[in-house]
């Protein structure tokens, strides 16, 4: 597993994207929030509480919240059709709090889905010193997203993510999806979610993750995240994630573990993948990379997880010169606490 390859993959999850959307079927209003030089448009801006149908076809965002509003709740809603974000909570300019519960957020991306690096169903961010974005994402059904299911970014963001069903496309060769991502110093917990079908079969040096905790490589570390009692993948075809849980917090040179403790916890998760579909995660031309749990950090705890299936049966685990398949990969970790995990081929 080459850290630079995976770093470039994970950064793309948040920082890239190339197009601004098709002709509008909704009333799409500029938000003042820019991505990829575009002033993002939204079908709804600071609407307070929302339920029911939100058809955002033609807009960049379905429902947009920022500090100029009073926050709100998205409950029992059906949000679809935007090409960048289904629900976006932007706390850059001040405190913003939104609950997203019992809702369906789907078909977020281009039509058809393609390899441009955007399309996130539920997105929280607070990337300034004075901002915050908080809330709960629970009981939601998230599917048919282009890049990511649920993403929480930056040190001012803190979200509890629990009881959601997040379904990727299965093995696809055009983009490396991630199911749930907490990164760039964000806080939160990820508990009792079901995440399946995040798998990349292309040749561009990438692996997908069911749950990704991302930091380091010159960015803030993401620390103290609890990942507990999630179901990641299943024995059904196309349900596996290339990496069940990826804890990725390298040093500033992106070549090894950081100097500070990351203290992330992966406990009591069921992680399954019966297929070998990744061919480039260990570097283009070198081979694939799949792992039940990947740890790049310091003093992380990997305890009492059940890992099974051909897709995580160890073969050349830790190699950087050929396809590497791991149940638990701590080859780039320091002081990892690995205890009472059950690994079944």
What residue spans do the PLM features occupy?
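Extracellular beta-strand/beta-solenoid scaffold signature
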Residues: 29-39, 57-65, 81-92, 111-129, ...
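Parallel beta-helix/beta-solenoid
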Residues: 40, 45, 67-69, 74, ...
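Bacterial N-terminal signal peptides
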Residues: 7-18
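Leucine-rich solenoid repeat scaffolds
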Residues: 299-345
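Sec/Tat signal peptide C-region and signal peptidase I cleavage site
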Residues: 20-25
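Positively charged n-region of N-terminal signal peptides that target proteins for export
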Residues: 1-5
């Amino acid at each position: 597993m080459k850290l630079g390859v995976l770093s470039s993959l994970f950064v793309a999850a948040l920082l890239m994207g190339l197009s601004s959307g098709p002709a509008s079927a909704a009333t799409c209003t500029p938000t003042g929030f820019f991505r990829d030089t575009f002033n993002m448009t939204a079908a709804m801006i600071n609407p307070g509480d929302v339920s029911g149908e939100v058809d955002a076809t033609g807009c960049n965002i379905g429902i947009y919240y920022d500090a100029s509003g009073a926050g709100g709740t998205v409950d029992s809603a059906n949000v679809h059709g935007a090409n960048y974000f289904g629900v976006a909570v932007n706390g850059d300019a001040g405190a913003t709090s939104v609950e997203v519960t019992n809702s369906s957020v789907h078909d977020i991306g281009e039509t058809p889905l393609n390899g441009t690096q955007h399309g996130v169903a539920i997105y929280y961010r607070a990337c300034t010193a004075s901002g915050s974005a908080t809330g709960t994402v629970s009981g939601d059904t998230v599917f048919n997203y282009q890049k990511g299911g649920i993403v929480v970014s930056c040190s001012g963001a803190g979200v509890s993510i629990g009881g959601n069903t997040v379904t990727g496309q299965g093995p696809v060769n055009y983009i490396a999806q991630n199911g749930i991502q907490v990164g760039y110093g964000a806080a939160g917990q990820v508990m009792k979610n079901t995440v399946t079908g995040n798998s990349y079969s292309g040749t561009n040096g990438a692996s997908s993750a069911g749950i990704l905790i991302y930091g380091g490589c010159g960015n803030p570390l993401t620390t103290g995240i609890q990942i507990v009692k999630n179901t990641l993948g299943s024995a059904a075809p196309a349900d596996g994630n290339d990496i069940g849980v990826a804890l990725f917090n390298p040093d500033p040179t992106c070549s090894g573990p950081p100097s500070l403790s990351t203290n992330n916890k992966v406990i009591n998760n069921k992680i399954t993948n019966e297929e070998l579909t990744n061919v480039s995660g260990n570097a283009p031309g070198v081979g694939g990379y799949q792992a039940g749990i990947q740890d790049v950090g310091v003093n992380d705890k990997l305890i009492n997880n059940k890992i099974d299936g051909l897709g995580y049966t160890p073969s050349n685990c830790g190699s950087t010169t050929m396809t590497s398949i791991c149940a638990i990969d701590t080859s780039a970790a320091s002081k990892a606490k690995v205890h009472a995990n059950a690994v079944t081929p």
